Amino acid sequence: MQLNTLKPAEGSKKNRRRVGRGIGSGLGKTAGRGHKGQKSRSGGFHKVGFEGGQMPMYRRLPKRGFVSMTRRHVGQITLNDLAKINLPEVDLLVLKAHGFAGEQINAVKVIKTGELKIAVTLKGLTATAGAKAAIEAAGGKLVELA
């Protein structure tokens, strides 16, 4: 097999249907749109949610709730992930730089999955009770930012 002899699989490449190009094509005259009516006209289709003049569902139901613009997006990080970073001090910016927290994340909680053998100082992060005990047992500490 050579690159210049490669061909697409049989039947995998179909030609685009050219409608409205004579009766011999099988898709001439009405071009698959049937006879008359709104759907046969160019630009003749209703907007999304239109129910033929009946009061549409999205207007029959009441408005409800809102999306808070100041919502906290909390991420999670495990003790195994902290061990992979292998730095003495870790904060949110370090986690973002190493790809452990996404762009939208504005708070991170450490959970106890795996084990930590190095002393790590966590700045501005929260932790579960088990994770906090494991971090302190390894010689690390949690520092709250004011």
Swiss-Prot record:
Residue ranges crossing the lipid bilayer per the database entry: none
Entry annotated with the keyword Ribosomal protein: yes
One function term, GO molecular function aspect: structural constituent of ribosome
Keywords per UniProt: Ribonucleoprotein, Ribosomal protein, RNA-binding, rRNA-binding
Keyword Ribosomal protein found: yes
Region (Disordered): 1-51
Disulfide bond annotation, renumbered to this chain: none
Any one of the GO CC terms: cytosolic large ribosomal subunit
Similarity remark: Belongs to the universal ribosomal protein uL15 family.
Primary role: Binds to the 23S rRNA.
Oligomeric form and interacting partners: Part of the 50S ribosomal subunit.
HAMAP family for the chain: Ribosomal_uL15 (MF_01341)
Alphabetical list of NCBIfam families matching this protein: rplO_bact (TIGR01071)
UniProt cross-references to PANTHER family, sorted A to Z: 50S RIBOSOMAL PROTEIN L15 (PTHR12934), LARGE RIBOSOMAL SUBUNIT PROTEIN UL15M (PTHR12934:SF11)
Descriptive protein name: Large ribosomal subunit protein uL15
